[in-house]
Amino acid sequence: MHFFYPPIRMDLVEISYPDNVSKNVLERTKTISKNMGRSVVVLKKETPGFIVNRMLAALVDEAYELYDEGIAEFEDIDIAIKKGLNHPLGPFELSDYSGLDIHYYAKLKKFEESGDLRDKPKTFLKEKVLKGDLGVKTGKGFYKYNKE
């Protein structure tokens, strides 16, 4: 079962259903999730990132590429995604909430496994992580946050 953060706002649960899990376990897991008021999606095969994070990674990668190429400022990319795709957060805001260190190390791991330069973390992301600007949890990432 994969819940989303923050769970009080995000009602989706992704359930991975590999071949070695019984149909009974799947049905019980779906029932438990629905009893918690969750929407349920089932993956027939395991995949890194499940459905949502795999799709989201492509969006964030493109946003980072647009910013890195100097095509648009990160604030404008966030506005475009929020207004144009009706997302509640833009990719840079979401990165700040997830933690820039999480994004950096996930990309680094993927790059180490694939060797594909497209998977290499962007320099601007590495610089933010090295400076300790990790997003909401440190009060600064792409945006500044009031630490309470």
Language-model regions: role of each:
Residues 23-28, 34-45, 64, 68-69, ...:
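NAD(P)-dependent Rossmann-like dehydrogenase/reductase catalytic/cofactor-binding core
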Residues 52-53, 61, 95:
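Residue-level micro-sites within transmembrane alpha helices that shape
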Residues 24, 50, 58:
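Short alpha-helical
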Residues 48-55, 70:
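Glycine-rich phosphate/pyrophosphate-binding loop and the adjoining helix
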Residues 8, 58-59:
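Alpha-helix N-cap/N′ positions at the starts of helices
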Residues 1-44, 53:
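Rossmann-fold dinucleotide-binding core
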Residues 14-17, 60, 64, 111:
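A broad detector of the eukaryotic-type serine/threonine protein kinase catalytic domain
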Residues 17-18, 51-52, 113-114, 120:
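A generic structural signal for short
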